[in-house]
Curated annotation (Swiss-Prot):
Free-text description of this protein's post-translational modifications in UniProt: Proteolytic processing into mature chains is required for histone eviction during spermatogenesis. Transition proteins (TNP1 and TNP2) are required for processing.
Single GO MF descriptor: DNA binding
Phosphoserine PTM sites in chain numbering: S8, S10, S37
Tissues of expression: Testis.
One BP annotation, GO: spermatogenesis
InterPro entries listed in its UniProt record: PRM2
Lineage of producing organism: Eukaryota, Metazoa, Chordata, Craniata, Vertebrata
UniProt-recorded name of the protein: Protamine-2
Top-rank lineage group of the source organism: Eukaryota
Amino acid sequence: MVRYRVRSPSEPSHEVYRQQLHGQEQGHHGQEEQGLSPEHVEVYERTHGHSHYRRRHCSRRRLRRIHRQQHRSCRRRKRRSCRHRRKHRRGCRTRRRTCRRH
């Protein structure tokens, strides 16, 4: 899921801020070196910060690939789906524990 911030109609667009930033002298990525005023610092943090996050669920294509590999050998199953996210496994379909080949 990707979360975006909705801009209010009274708020200027990102292009206006970009023009203001490029109009001033730019040093490194520090906010003081760019000469940003306090309200521009807030805008800079909002537009260049890490407020956007992506949540990646197991896609159907990936799940299908995992299930396709499963029937090769029932004993040596590779558990790849959501291995890194063991607590929040609700987004993925859980596989059956028993072998369905018989």
